[in-house]
């Protein structure tokens, strides 16, 4: 390979041409400032160019002349494009012309916001009790070749009021009864008789004055008083309360008025008042004060949620809800209630306890070797199987639910014991739905046919030992039952007859034996006592009773 030799003159010329092309392309993309030019000059709100132009670029050193716009003191100035492609900035070249100094209107004030030069504004206000007639503001504007205010100064006029309202049985007094303006006071009085005796009570403020709410229209400071007949009362007024009893324009002595506070307010004092003399209400009128809202509910509920309403006023309700798998222990809500004059929450935060499902205590029939727990929680599963000799009724798999129940319900292990009905079913109704075999827990209902009597319970259940509880009944023929009853009664009568006969025989034998003994000893028999007595005593007894009837049942025996 040969080493490269220096460029010959032709090569140097080619390289130079290529470099020139590159430079030309680069110059095409350079900004005007790089080439020594200024962009279009800025617009001035206070001046305009003397010779307007549509050029967008200007070479360095170009000067443009401007003159002040109307409203400004006329003066020419110029700006120049500097070498850094920036226009020079004019300062304090156009000064705004000044309007005449405004004067305060009578009974008013003028307010100069900034100054009184071209473009500035001023405002007018009236003194208290006066209203503004005309424009409330003015601006310094161009007027012909000068500047002037665009509106004349307004007038401040005294605020007028209408004629005071008249009242029955009275009148107002004022120095002027035709012209009423702001600040004037009128006083009311009630009529009297020819001798000046008082006939009415003046109820309310005796004097009212002319005032204004909006500074334009005059109004009286309050309602006029009333001239009320003696021993009458005007309707009482309680702020934030309503009258629930019958309302009237006038109340007589001892009339009652009952109040109720509006929602959100609590009453302090008696709700009922009575009309007394001199337009007095007794006891003192109540007051209705605004009930404060309950404070923010700050309690938290682990494993649950607390739902708090936006409005925490009286009656607001906070609700507690446990997460799935937990059950609420305590109140499910708390209410904002009144405690004296304070608003409080009436319940604290409850507790969310984990749901526990339990197996039944009686697990007879289930396999003992199964892995069973004492407590099962929400979502836990249990599998149950029966021992030999038992049949599983239900699903062998069950899951603990959020309400502590099992789904599907826990199965049962039913013994395979079979209870049978007796072979002799004579006397029982043939149309009964009876099965051949009954299993543990099955029930049977039996009834007898006509002519038979059911002895025992008509309902019976198959037990785990293949017996019936209560025992199965019997159907006994009614004829047999009558015969048995007759025999039973005859036996009872016979037994009673034998007992009575035996008693009579024994009594007769005892009396005969006593008589024989009395004969042997020569004494008398006393039939009342079935005993022997001495003859002398018996004789004495007979003599004493000679006036009466002879002794009954006495026997004598000669010796």
Swiss-Prot record:
UniProt subunit comment: Interacts with C3b.
Signal peptide: 1-35
Cell compartments where the protein resides: Membrane
Residues of the Sushi domain: 36-96, 97-158, 159-229, 231-290, 292-354, 355-415, 417-477
Disulfide bond positions: 38-81, 68-94, 99-140, 126-156, 161-210, 190-227, 233-275, 261-288, 294-336, 322-352, 357-400, 386-413, 419-462, 448-475
Purpose: Acts as a cofactor for complement factor I, a serine protease which protects autologous cells against complement-mediated injury by cleaving C3b and C4b deposited on host tissue. Also acts as a decay-accelerating factor, preventing the formation of C4b2a and C3bBb, the amplification convertases of the complement cascade. Seems to act as a costimulatory factor for T-cells. May play a crucial role in early embryonic development by maintaining fetomaternal tolerance.
Annotated positions of the Phosphothreonine modification: 540
Residue numbers carrying Phosphoserine: 527, 531, 537, 554
Annotated keywords: Complement pathway, Developmental protein, Disulfide bond, Glycoprotein, Immunity, Innate immunity, Membrane, Phosphoprotein, Pregnancy, Receptor, Repeat, Signal, Sushi, Transmembrane, Transmembrane helix
Protein family according to the UniProt entry: Belongs to the receptors of complement activation (RCA) family.
Glycan attachment sites: 53, 331
SMART domains per the UniProt record, alphabetical: CCP
Extracellular side: 36-482
Residue intervals passing through the bilayer: 483-503
GO BP annotations, alphabetical order: cellular response to hypoxia; complement activation; complement activation, classical pathway; female pregnancy; in utero embryonic development; innate immune response; negative regulation of complement activation; negative regulation of complement activation, classical pathway
Record's bilayer topology term: Single-pass type I membrane protein
Protein name: Complement component receptor 1-like protein
Cytoplasmic side: 504-559
GO CC, one annotated term: basolateral plasma membrane
Lineage: Eukaryota, Metazoa, Chordata, Craniata, Vertebrata
Chain segments carrying region Disordered: 535-559
């Amino acid at each position: 390979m040969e080493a490269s030799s220096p460029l010959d003159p032709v090569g140097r010329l080619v390289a130079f041409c290529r470099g020139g092309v590159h430079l030309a392309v680069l110059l095409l993309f350079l900004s005007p400032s790089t080439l020594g030019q200024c962009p279009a000059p800025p617009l001035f709100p206070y001046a305009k160019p003397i010779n307007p132009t549509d050029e967008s670029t200007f070479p360095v050193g170009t000067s443009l002349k401007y003159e002040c716009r109307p409203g400004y003191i006329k003066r020419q100035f110029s700006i120049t494009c500097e070498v850094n492609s920036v226009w020079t900035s004019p300062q304090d070249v156009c000064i705004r012309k000044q309007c005449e100094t405004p004067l305060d209107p009578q009974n008013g004030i003028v307010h100069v916001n900034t100054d009184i030069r071209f473009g500035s504004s001023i405002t007018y206000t009236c003194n208290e009790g006066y209203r503004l007639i005309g424009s409330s503001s003015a601006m310094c504007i161009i007027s012909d070749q000068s500047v002037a205010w665009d509106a004349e100064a307004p007038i401040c006029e005294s605020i007028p009021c209408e004629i005071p309202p008249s009242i029955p049985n009275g009148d107002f007094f004022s120095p002027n009864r035709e012209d009423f303006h702001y600040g004037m006071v009128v006083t009311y009085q009630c009529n009297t008789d020819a001798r000046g005796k008082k006939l009415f009570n003046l109820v309310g403020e005796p004097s009212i004055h002319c005032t204004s709410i909006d500074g334009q229209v005059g109004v009286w400071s309050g309602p006029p008083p009333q001239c009320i007949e003696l021993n009458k009362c005007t309707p009482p007024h309680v702020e934030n309360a309503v009258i629930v009893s019958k309302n009237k324009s006038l109340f007589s002595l001892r009339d009652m008025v009952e109040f109720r506070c509006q929602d959100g307010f609590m009453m302090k004092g008696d709700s009922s008042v009575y009309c007394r003399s001199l337009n007095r209400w007794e006891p003192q009128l109540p007051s209705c004060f605004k009930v404060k809202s309950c404070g923010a509910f700050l309690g938290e509920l682990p494993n649950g949620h607390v739902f708090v309403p936006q409005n925490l006023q009286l009656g607001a309700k906070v609700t507690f809800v446990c997460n799935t798998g937990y059950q609420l222990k305590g109140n499910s809500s708390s209410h904002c209630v009144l405690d004296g004059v304070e608003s409080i929450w009436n319940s604290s935060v409850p507790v969310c306890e984990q749901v526990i499902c339990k197996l039944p205590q009686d697990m007879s029939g289930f396999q003992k070797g199964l892995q069973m727990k004492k407590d099962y929680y929400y979502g836990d599963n249990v599998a149950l199987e029966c021992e030999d000799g038992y049949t599983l009724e239900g699903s062998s798999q069950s899951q603990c639910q959020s309400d502590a129940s099992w789904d599907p319900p826990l199965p049962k292990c039913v013994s395979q014991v079979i209870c049978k009905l007796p072979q002799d079913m004579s006397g029982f109704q043939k149309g009964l739905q009876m099965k051949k075999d009954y299993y543990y827990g099955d029930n049977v209902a039996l009834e007898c046919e006509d002519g038979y009597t059911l002895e025992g319970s008509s309902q019976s259940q198959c037990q785990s030992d293949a017996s019936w509880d209560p025992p199965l009944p019997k159907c006994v023929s009614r004829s047999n039952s009558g015969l048995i009853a007759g025999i039973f009664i005859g036996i009872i009568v016979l037994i009673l007859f034998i007992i009575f006969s035996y008693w009579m025989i024994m009594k007769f034998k005892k009396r005969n034996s006593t008589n024989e003994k009395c004969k042997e000893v020569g004494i008398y028999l006393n039939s009342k006592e079935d005993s022997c007595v001495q003859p002398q005593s018996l004789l004495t007894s007979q003599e004493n009773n000679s006036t009466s009837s002879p002794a009954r049942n006495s026997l004598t025996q000669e010796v």
